[in-house]
Regions:
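Catalytic beta/alpha-barrel core
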Residues: 46-51, 96, 130-133, 147-157
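Conserved, mostly hydrophobic/aromatic
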Residues: 18, 75, 121, 233
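Charged helix-capping and loop-helix junction motifs
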Residues: 30-31, 134-140
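Acidic (Asp/Glu)-rich catalytic clusters
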Residues: 35-39, 60-73, 112-115
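Glycine/small-residue-rich loop that forms an oxyanion/phosphate-binding "nest" at active or ligand-binding sites
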Residues: 80-120
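C-terminal alpha-helical cap/extension of soluble enzyme domains
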Residues: 189-261
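Active-site rim beta-loop-alpha module in soluble metabolic enzymes
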Residues: 157-215
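A short alpha/beta connector and helix-capping loop motif
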Residues: 24-55
Length: 261
């Protein structure tokens, strides 16, 4: 079953996107398509230095998020800018905890400068996938959220979901509109054909289905139950703005509203 916030009997679904990731060759912030994406979302996952982002990008993206009334989240990552945080790292848990704390704190400072606050944590890339099954790294991520009293985004059924419940952390289950799923409910690796869903009509159709009956068709055709609170489109997916517009239209057409939890 699909679960999300309800107000006066009307379901409210969050829509999120990864922002603050566009860097030029020397590594400085050059801006991206945030101005086009922010009006389409209710939560912004802001890169905070692990895989991308710097002080300027964090400050500017947070300022735009505040202007649009969009919730700010820390998109923490393995410390691996070279591979954009998409390579798994066998890093010791204490070192990972130190890195994630620094990333989170940097974003908190940037948000505060522009009158914003960080409301949640979302792991990025390889870390997101690792904490589905890796206990020690899942513990680091959940403890970060618990320590700062914020929510945590993640995959339904992951180790982070279980640990979040134990520590009293609000866990917001995420569904990806632009990513294909395997039959076990995990994301299809980006290296495999069909891992990305870039057709707006296809994104709209699968969004309509998951909101209406709580199911996703896996890459192999299997029908999988999908519980979620927030829907993601990656900003680096081709045509991200068009895909987000398709998600919004599909959600609203079901009678649900869009907004942060």
């Amino acid at each position: 079953m699909t679960h999300s916030t309800e107000t006066a009997g009307v379901r409210r679904i969050d829509v999120n996107c990864d922002l603050g990731e566009a860097l030029d060759a020397p590594g400085g912030w050059r801006g991206g398509h945030e101005p086009a994406l922010l009006p389409l979302i209710s939560s912004a996952n802001v890169a905070c230095g692990g895989h991308a982002g710097d002080a300027r990008s964090m400050r500017e993206v947070c300022a735009m998020a505040v202007q649009h009334g969009v919730r700010i989240g820390a998109q923490v990552s393995y410390p691996d800018r070279e591979h954009f945080g998409r390579r798994a790292l066998d890093i010791a848990a204490p070192l990972l905890a130190e890195s994630l704390e620094e990333q989170f704190s940097d974003l908190v400072a940037a948000a505060a400068e522009v009158g914003g606050r960080v409301a949640y944590v979302k792991p990025h890339g390889a870390l997101y996938n690792a904490v589905v099954t890796r206990d020690d790294h899942a513990a680091v991520v959940v403890e970060l959220a618990a320590r700062h009293g914020v929510s945590l985004f993640g995959l339904h059924g992951s180790r982070t979901a279980t640990r979040a419940t134990t520590l009293g952390v609000r866990f917001e289950r995420e569904w990806f509109a632009d990513r294909a799923y395997l039959a076990d409910g995990t994301l299809t690796p980006r290296s495999e054909p069909g891992a990305l869903v870039v057709d707006a009509a296809a994104v709209a159709a699968r969004t309509t289905r998951v909101v209406s009956d709580g199911h996703t068709v896996a890459l192999d055709g299997a029908l999988i139950g999908t519980a979620f609170d927030t829907i993601c489109v990656h900003s680096d997916t081709r045509g991200a703005a068009e895909l987000l517009a398709a998600v919004r239209a599909a959600v609203l057409a079901t009678g649900a509203t869009i907004g942060a939890a």
